[in-house]
Amino acid sequence: MSSLDEVAESRKQRLAELRKIKQLENKTRDSQEVQKNVIEHRNYDPEVQAPKMGFVEPPNMIESVEALSKEIEEKTKRKIEEQSSVPVEELDLVTLRPKKPTWDLERDLKERMRSLETQNQNAIAFYIQQLISERAHSTEKA
């Protein structure tokens, strides 16, 4: 019977521990619910009982759009100055020649023409064979 008493005692201890854990969880839930019910005054100052005017905190120095645009403007000015400092004599006019106005059309047509090229060659061969056979028939008749 002593073993049954030990098992019962250990069970009582485990249940007591579970009750304590559950009570702690309930307390934390209650405190969280209280925190949720706190009213945030974003535009209203309860001490003055009037709307907030101006900035409460000083502006921070996070990168703004204006700062970024100034940086981009300075970079482009530097690039333009670097490009203008390159002497004209160094540029080779032969390498700067423009492409044909239809270069992109030719590029697109090359793929289509590949498949048509074999058909074209077959048709030419057929007409040549037909011409040869007609000449052979005409020489036989004559």
From Swiss-Prot:
Keywords: mRNA processing, mRNA splicing, Nucleus. GO terms for cellular component: cytosol; nucleus; post-mRNA release spliceosomal complex; Prp19 complex; spliceosomal complex; U2-type spliceosomal complex. Its main location: nucleus. Residues 24-45 have a biased composition (Basic and acidic residues). Pfam families: cwf18. Signal peptide: none annotated. InterPro entries: mRNA_splic_Cwf18-like. The keyword Nucleus applies. One of its GO terms (biological process) is mRNA cis splicing, via spliceosome. Transmembrane segments: none annotated. Residues 24-54 are annotated as: Disordered. It is found in: Nucleus. It comes from the Eukaryota. The keyword Lyase does not apply. Belongs to the 40S cdc5-associated complex (or cwf complex), a spliceosome sub-complex reminiscent of a late-stage spliceosome composed of the U2, U5 and U6 snRNAs and at least brr2, cdc5, cwf2/prp3, cwf3/syf1, cwf4/syf3, cwf5/ecm2, spp42/cwf6, cwf7/spf27, cwf8, cwf9, cwf10, cwf11, cwf12, prp45/cwf13, cwf14, cwf15, cwf16, cwf17, cwf18, cwf19, cwf20, cwf21, cwf22, cwf23, cwf24, cwf25, cwf26, cyp7/cwf27, cwf28, cwf29/ist3, lea1, msl1, prp5/cwf1, prp10, prp12/sap130, prp17, prp22, sap61, sap62, sap114, sap145, slu7, smb1, smd1, smd3, smf1, smg1 and syf2. Involved in mRNA splicing where it associates with cdc5 and the other cwf proteins as part of the spliceosome. This is Pre-mRNA-splicing factor cwf18. It comes from Schizosaccharomyces pombe (strain 972 / ATCC 24843) (Fission yeast). The gene is cwf18.
